[in-house]
Each structure stands twice: as C-alpha cells, then as structure tokens.
Amino acid sequence: MQLSLALDDRPLLPRMRDRLLARLGPRRDGRRRDPVSQLVRSMLGSKTRDEVARRVFTELRRRYPSWDGLTEASPRAVLRVIWPVNLAEPKAEQLPQALRMIVACTGHLALDHLADLDEQAAMQWLRRLPGIGSKTAAAVLNFSTLRKRALVVDTHLLRLGGRLGLLPRDADCDTGYEQLMRQLPDAWDADDLSELHRLMTLLGQTICIARAPACTACPLRDLCPRCGV
C-alpha cells in the first residue's frame, strides 16, 4: 500500500507563522498610538527593555502632555526624564530635534501626511529624521494609526532569520528589513506583520535566545538548519 504524505510546500514564513500561532496563540493588539507618539515611544525603546521604555514613555508624557512642549525642551531637561533608557544622552538630543524637524517640514507636529505615501516613500521620509533607523521607522508606520505594511525587524528577528536561513547571519536591521519584506506573502496586511513581529520576538525572548537556545522545545525545530548547533 502506498502512503500519501501531505507535504507543506509553502514558503517558510507562512509555515513559521502557523506554527507560532499554534504554540503561542494570537498576538494582535488593537491599541494604536498616533504616529508622533509612536515615534517617541519607539525612539525610547531602541536597545532598551520594553518595561523600562514603557515606564519612561509614561513619565515623559506626564511631563509633556503635548509633544509640542518637547520640541522646546533642552537636552538636559529631557535627559532628567529619560535617563533609565539605554543611550539616554543621544536620545535626549535626538528626540526634540526629530520633532522640530517634523514641524519644519510639515508646518505642524503631525505625521498624518505619511498616510498618502507608499511604504517605501514613508520609510525614506522618516529616516531623514535624527535618530531614526529602519526599525523605528517601521514601528511608526506599522504600530501606529497609520497601519502600514512595514515589518519591524529587531535583534530577535535578525537572530531567528539568520538561524532559519531567511537572512545572512550577519544581517543588520536595514538588510533584514529589505530581505524579509521581499519574502512576505502579498496578501498579508499590516496586522499580519505586527503579529508576526510579536510572535517572532516572543520566541526569541523565550526559546530561540542568543546563547544556549532551547532547540528541543522550539516549534520550528524541524524547519531550522541550525537546530542543536
């Protein structure tokens, strides 16, 4: 008797997402900040633990109920609030600079005009701002009310992508963003991309950690050429 095996010949990313959803459950969050608030939150969160960045963002918002006040703040005043985050000193310089540049370019402190641009043009616009790389720009576009199709690529996604063969092992955030975006199914929307980011980040924080990953517990172990290496 001949057995018929049902092989999943889909590209790797859709298979990964299905496995992660089955193990970790849905990771969608309907709460979205306005784009300027998301920019501030993402700049604070760069290279900083989420719980620290959340706490500092809340305190910064309390100190500056309107972000217009932050445009006029001195780096020293900003640093007194954001000191717990990593790279606090350059961020204290860059935050007011970025907001002032938005005002200079648009006439007011808002990023609503990005809604009319495609993803690539919006990314390029944001990356002209001080302190904004591809990760922060993608977070503004994807996590905010702009709800654009941009994948936020952090160190966890770079590590998973390198181990799974989706990316070169030495890829940086820019390369990772460009290459992963090309591999995403066209049918996936902004919510699909934000969920993929959260799923992969959670896997990277709990199982596929930087050192001594728990490969035997990983739902992607049979898809990973570096499993057990």
Question: Where do the protein language model's features map onto the residues?
Answer:
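Catalytic cores of DNA base-excision repair glycosylases
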Residues: 2-229
